[in-house]
Amino acid sequence: MEGIIVLDKPQDFTSFDAVAIVRGLTRERRIGHTGTLDPMATGVLPLLLGRATKAVSLLPETAKTYEASFRFGEAYTTGDVTGEVIKTDETPVLRAALETALDSFRGDILQVPPMYSAVSVNGQRLYKLARQGIEVEREARPVHIAELTLLEYNENEKTGKLHVTCSKGTYIRTLIEDIAQKCGTVGAMTALRRTAACGFTLADAVLLDTLKAMKENGESFDEILRPVEKLFSMLTAVSVTPAQAQRYLNGGALTISRCRAPKIAMPEGTQVALYEDGEKFLGLARAENGEFKYVKSFSEK
């Protein structure tokens, strides 16, 4: 089996749990995912099967989109309501003040990763230290918030929901805590749903229960498998001849001027997706010294 199953991960399952369950259902041993979702989070989790697992280390940097629910007035050890309350605050937050605060978090910002995260400091995972009650200094990291919209807000309950499109490595829990601080209070994430990642949306996703039902009914999973090239749809597509395709699959370089590449600037290091006759996906190549150099193929020779 080869391709991508876009899972709508259920709450209270780790990403590893999801991989293990799908491995059991599909009998495909080679399965990986494109980015961890916390157990409390739900939503888009692309799972790579078979040869598609080779794409994990090659994924382009793409934004991810979330809907995040929050509540002001309580701070938690974990930054979300799965932890223990460590501080309360009754400061009111008006919608107008919240909207103004959000302006400070759009675009390029610096964010300190939370203690309850998989980030390593001096070779130790932060979450392991946090579980021992140890807090260490962490360096702020640059992240990009492309979209930040207040979808809902109840001033009396101090609860609401945000739409967030952000770069890889952004912690939504921390974003909410920082927004609360900007509003002069404390806050925490109460729910998180990833609505888009790696070019996929919830419209592409299937539930675990659906996969289980398909297995029980003897249905093929082929109809829900997405092609691996979907992961690279944001790259420039280059068409090559069958002879060039064979040279590429053997590890050879291709002269850019002899390929049917779009007439656009191709800076050194640009990664492209190669297709035989514009249809069959071959793999990835990199522009270097007037040639497309082999990076990784996803096609049999």
List each language-model region with its residue ranges.
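Accessory RNA 3′-end/elbow-binding domains used by RNA modification enzymes
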Residues: M1-D12, F16-H33, L37, A41-T42, ...
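Catalytic cores of RNA-modifying enzymes
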Residues: M1-S167, T174-V206
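A short local loop/turn or secondary-structure capping micro-motif enriched for an aromatic residue
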Residues: V136, G169, G290-K293
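Glycine-rich beta-strand-to-loop/alpha-helix junction loops that act as flexible
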Residues: K168-G169, Y248
